[in-house]
Curated annotation (Swiss-Prot):
Record-stated family: Belongs to the class-III pyridoxal-phosphate-dependent aminotransferase family. BioA subfamily.
Highest rank taxon of the organism: Bacteria
One GO cellular component, as annotated: cytoplasm
GO biological processes: biotin biosynthetic process
GO molecular function, one term: adenosylmethionine-8-amino-7-oxononanoate transaminase activity
Location in the cell: Cytoplasm
Name assigned to this protein: Adenosylmethionine-8-amino-7-oxononanoate aminotransferase
Gene this protein is translated from: bioA
Site (Participates in the substrate recognition with KAPA and in a stacking interaction with the adenine ring of SAM): 23
């Protein structure tokens, strides 16, 4: 055996021996291991030299492709100055510059930026800010949170407490604080199949919950326009705006989680722009650095910030912060990422690509085992079902989504399923030709797996 092949196999075996991969059953991984060695553009290459389309943007975050020169150069330039210094009590230039740019990019009422290292932490910060805000202004009864059924906001304890995906969260229930769960306006499988009816029913249920419990509710948290990990379900038109209006009516803070949806993913800078929504608190991560480094942020209003401002003896300080918060390398990457957005007018390109993808995905509705195709911008979910007419799902034990993504891998494309929902979230810079090729590969894999193996 050649030396190169020995080295490749060695990395694979070491991955099985030493690593514990996130959201991964390691028994499955041992049967189908994958070790990535490099990336270029929208492609990833494993240690065996096989190249794949990055069909899930390396978990929904890559924007311009891998090894984007401008971002690489920005990180190198920052390394010549300093890699990291703490943000606890001492600011740094990239963090200041990025905060200024984020304020410029987001709705005008958001004026303050609190950094963190991941989307889940950004959510934790949002929850803690909302909770402490009411205490700081003397409204101590407002301690509860409202979230949506099937929602997902990260995997830390606070984030799962406002999540509602049983397979992820049930085992940890004894650790979690209690939150109110409002129904999500799920159109697929609803008896009426009318988005307006579904929207109004969900808003009616939410208003009833608010009317009964508003005096104890600190905030409501929702994902921006589309539930990601819950199955790529798009909110009916007017729902998000309706939630905002109810929060205002009942004096409840409104948190929008844009971790997955922000930075162009839905065809707007941020998903809230689809309905001109103005949250009190907004979280961002994933695409903020173009998919390079772990930076996240929680943005809020001057009114909320002012509730924490005062003499130390007033005990209004927000006691939160991690060691690498506001890291200079990550902030430099994020600034370069946003500059590329602006220079290349990427939002306009994404809108054109989203239209193209919708046209390409239309034919999936003709497949025998595709029950629903859902899309907002370049966030897409294809739900596989046993019976398209009755919407009967596959038994979860058949793992049809997982098997289909393994077929896709064989063909040269990587993604991860959400149960039996195939996720298609390509890098935003993918060309029309690349999008067409990935969609064709995905369609072939669905047909091959569901027809021949299902």
């Amino acid at each position: 055996m050649e030396k190169g092949m020995v080295a490749m196999n060695e990395w694979i075996e070491k991955s099985k021996t030493y690593l514990w991969l996130p959201f991964t059953q390691m028994k499955d991984y041992e049967q189908h291991p994958l070790v990535i060695e490099s990336g270029e553009g929208i492609f990833l290459t494993d240690v065996n030299g096989k190249t794949y389309y990055d069909g899930y943007s390396s978990l929904w975050l890559n924007v311009h492709g891998h090894r984007k020169k401008e971002i690489d150069d920005a990180i190198r330039a920052q390394l010549e100055r300093i890699a990291h210094s703490t943000l606890l009590g001492a600011a740094n230039i990239p963090a200041i510059a990025l905060a200024e740019k984020l304020i410029e990019w987001t709705p005008s009422h958001l004026t303050r930026v609190f950094y963190s290292d991941s989307g889940a932490e950004a959510v934790e910060i949002a929850l803690k800010i909302a909770f402490q805000y009411w205490r700081n202004i003397g409204e101590n009864k407002k301690q509860k949170f409202v979230t949506l059924a099937n929602g997902y906001h990260g995997d830390t304890v606070g984030a799962i407490s406002v999540g509602a995906i049983d397979i992820f969260h049930t085992v940890y229930e004894p650790l979690m604080f209690t939150s109110y769960k409002a129904p999500f306006p799920l159109v697929y499988r609803h008896p009426s199949n009318d988005p307006n009816v579904v929207r109004d029913e969900a808003l009616g249920a939410l208003e009833a919950l608010f009317a009964e419990h508003h005096e104890e509710i600190a905030a409501m948290i929702v994902e921006g326009m589309i539930q990601g990990a819950g199955g790529m379900h798009v909110m009916p038109k007017g729902y998000l705006k309706g939630v905002e209006q109810l929060c205002r009516q009942y004096n409840i803070l409104f948190i929008v989680d844009e971790v997955a949806t922000g930075f162009g993913r839905t065809g707007k800078r941020f998903a809230i722009e689809h309905e001109d929504v103005q949250p009190d608190i907004m979280t961002v991560a994933k695409g903020i650095t173009g998919g390079y480094l772990p930076i996240a942020a929680t943005l809020t209003t001057e009114a909320i910030y002012e509730a924490f401002y005062g003499d130390y003896t007033e005990f209004k300080t927000f006691f939160h912060g991690h060691s690498y918060t506001g890291n200079q390398l990550g902030c430099a990457a994020a600034l370069a990422n946003i500059q590329i957005f602006e220079r290349e007018r990427l939002i306009e390109q994404i809108q054109q690509k989203a239209t193209f993808v919708a046209e390409q995905l239309a034919s999936f509705n003709e497949l025998n085992h595709v029950g629903d195709v859902r899309q907002l911008g370049l966030m897409c979910g294809i739900e596989l079902v046993r019976d398209r007419r009755t919407h009967e799902p596959y038994p979860w034990t058949e793992r049809m989504g997982y098997r289909t993504t393994l077929t896709m891998r064989e063909k040269g494309m990587l993604t991860r399923p959400l149960g039996d929902v195939i996720v298609f979230m390509p890098p935003l810079a993918s060309t029309f030709e690349q999008l067409e090729a990935m969609i064709a590969m995905m369609k072939e894999a669905i047909i091959e797996t569901t027809e021949k193996r299902g």
